[in-house]
Amino acid sequence: KFKFYYFLIVPFVLYILLKYFIFFEEYIELGKLDGLNWVETGAWGGLSLTFIISFFCLIFCFPIGMAFALGRRSGFPLIRYISIGFIEFWRGVPLITVLFMSAVMFPMFLPADFFIDKLVRCIIAISLFEAAYVAEVIRGGLQALPRGQYEAAKSLGMGYWRMHIFVILPQALKLVIPGIANTFLALVKDTPLIFVVGLLEIVGMLNLAKTNPEWLGFAMEGYVFAAIIFWIICYAMSKYSYNLEQKYKTDR
C-alpha cells in the first residue's frame, strides 16, 4: 500500500525540486542528466494527466474538508464563521469558473517574478472546491453521532483534539463513507473540465484528435473508449467504498 503511494508521490516531489530549486537546474545544465528533455506540464496530457489530477486532488481535499468540518462546529465564533464562509463560497461557485479564475485571473494578482505552474494552480483550485463538499459530508457524520459520545470522551479526561481524533472522527467517518465516495466519484468525472484552461486530459485529447483530418469519422469510438475508462475507474472506487462499508458495517 505504502509503496504504491510512494510510486505516485515521488515523481511529483521530484518535479517540484527540479522546477524550483537552482541546484537541480544546474545539475541538468551540467549534462548529468544528458539525453532527458524537460517536458513542461502544458505538454502533459491523456489518461496520465487524469490520474495525476484526480490523485492529488483526492489526497488534498480530504484533510482540508475535515478541518473545515470541525471548524464549522467549533465553539469559537471566528473559526466557525471563517469555516462557514469558506464552505459556502466554494459551494456557490461553478467549478468551470474556479478553473478559469485559477488559470487566467489569479496570475494577474501575483508579483511579476513569482510564478505558479498552471497545473499546480488547477490542482489547488479543484482541491479547495471539492474540500467544501467533503466538509459538509463529514459534518453530517459529526451531527449524526449522539451527544453521549462527546460526553463519554470528556468524562475520560480527553481534550478536544484527543476526543475528536480517537473517538468522534473514526465513528463519523464510518457513517459517511458513501457520501465521501460519491464526492470523490464526482471529482474524477469533473477532471475533463480542465480542457477549458488548455490542459488536455483524456477527453481533451479526444477533442483535439477529432479535428485531425486523419481521424475524421472516428470520434464516436474515442468517446466510447473514454466512457469505458471512466466507468472502470468509478466502478472500482464504488466497489472499494462498498467493501469499506461492509468491513465497518456502517449500516448497523
Regions inferred by a protein language model and the residue ranges of each:
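Transmembrane alpha-helices and adjacent helix-loop boundaries
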Residues: 1-252
